[in-house]
């Protein structure tokens, strides 16, 4: 019996210590943080989603106040709200601040803009006083869509000015800056009322904060343009860039070049290759301690983007001379990256699944760099193909053609 009691006491003590060691995250903000506009903010707001992503080691609390301004002389200053006092009492180990949207109101920014940086720095100081070891993260604001009633009467411009002020605050305070604007801006449908993100948008915000806190950006990733058989531009410094987990060492190797960099806190990294002469084939290797990406049969030469509508999309097999030219199309040093449209832009009604895909910017089918053959040249842009052949004949270097035409 004593052993059972002792075991119970030990388990209880471990549970208490575990609870005490949870990392507290305070989400400070306005109605967007609060979850206004969501059908069920108790399950859909970004702090709730963040809690699920971070797991039991973290305790996330929502201190969003609808209508709150950062400006202390604004129409509803956050620092005068009960949510602010609760956030201070919470004394979070991490404080994530997303304020500024309501400061675009004509009652606020035109009159008190000069106080914004000062007021923001003061707000940060109060959280540092509540917990001297606190980690502060501030966010560039979510977008405001052009459907907003005041968008053209000042809101658009003031929104941009406030973004710049927020960046200034981050530099002065020496704190981490995250971006809620970039991941939401391409998706206006995620802002149904032009201001408040829908549930999917809130999930994107949560993922942004999760990555900022943990440094987890999903590991080493590059653009789909990087594949075997690709061509890189000759005779110019070449930027190679991608995503990795924050702080990870990234090594880029090609030919006799070897470059090492580290992923920034936002996961982004880049290196600039020294100019390469036309030739190859080479292997481009990009690696972190946890992943290696190797691209083979890479050539250095001329790279051209062939974009447009139906005239550019018009395929080689549709030309009068296609039957004669297609059998002669094989060329190991001509490479094609053919981006075919997922759906035709004909006068037909698209169903809901197509519209959903388009809303998610899924315009093109997946593709990769290919060596030019009669089979793939037949379905490639005729204009682009003949242009590429002309370059091959005159320059005597490898040529890469990227076609993203949609008729």
Predicted regions and their residues:
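Conserved SGNH/GDSL esterase-like catalytic core that processes O-acyl groups on lipids
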Residues: 21-27, 32-121, 157, 276, ...
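Alpha-helical cap/lid subdomain in secreted, periplasmic
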Residues: 1, 20, 52, 56, ...
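Extended acidic/polar, glycine-enriched regions
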Residues: 241-324
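Secondary-structure boundary elements
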Residues: 310-377
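Proline/serine/threonine-rich low-complexity linkers at boundaries of modular beta-sandwich domains
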Residues: 217-222
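Structural beta-strand segments of beta-rich domains
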Residues: 228, 236-240
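Bacterial Sec-dependent N-terminal signal peptides
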Residues: 1-21
